[in-house]
Curated annotation (Swiss-Prot):
The gene is rpsM. Residues 108-122 have a biased composition (Basic residues). Part of the 30S ribosomal subunit. Forms a loose heterodimer with protein S19. Forms two bridges to the 50S subunit in the 70S ribosome. This is Small ribosomal subunit protein uS13. PANTHER family: 30S RIBOSOMAL PROTEIN S13/40S RIBOSOMAL PROTEIN S18, SMALL RIBOSOMAL SUBUNIT PROTEIN US13M. Signal peptide: none annotated. SUPFAM superfamilies: S13-like H2TH domain (SSF46946). Gene3D superfamilies: 1.10.8.50, 30s ribosomal protein s13, domain 2. Located at the top of the head of the 30S subunit, it contacts several helices of the 16S rRNA. In the 70S ribosome it contacts the 23S rRNA (bridge B1a) and protein L5 of the 50S subunit (bridge B1b), connecting the 2 subunits; these bridges are implicated in subunit movement. Contacts the tRNAs in the A and P-sites. The lineage of its organism: Bacteria, Pseudomonadati, Thermodesulfobacteriota, Desulfobacteria, Desulfobacterales. The keyword RNA-binding applies. One of its GO terms (molecular function) is rRNA binding. Residues 95-122 are annotated as: Disordered. PROSITE patterns: RIBOSOMAL_S13_1, RIBOSOMAL_S13_2.
Amino acid sequence: MARIAGVDLPRNKHVEIALTYIYGIGRTRSQQILEKVGINPTLKSDALTEEQVNDIRKVIDSDFKVEGELRTQISMNIKRLMDLGCYRGLRHRKSLPCRGQRTSTNARTRKGPKRAAVKKKK
């Protein structure tokens, strides 16, 4: 089982699909990496030689941010928006959608489950 960027790639899948198990690599990036290294995308990941795995590792390490490094960058970008106090930052702070969606009836995923209304005592 090949281990790239701290992720164990599944054995029985094509290399193109197996690389998408790494956070930050989708189908397009996977195809770009394999084209750069010169590996057939339909090759099964357990058929990769150690040299091919090392080539893939080098390309990923040099060209792309993946896994923890990418997660850190994304969270820092969101934190920066919140510190700036811009509209998007305020929406993140309030846990509301920040891309213009309606919130009157929808946005339950972002807002969380409904809270029961508190009745006033008479």
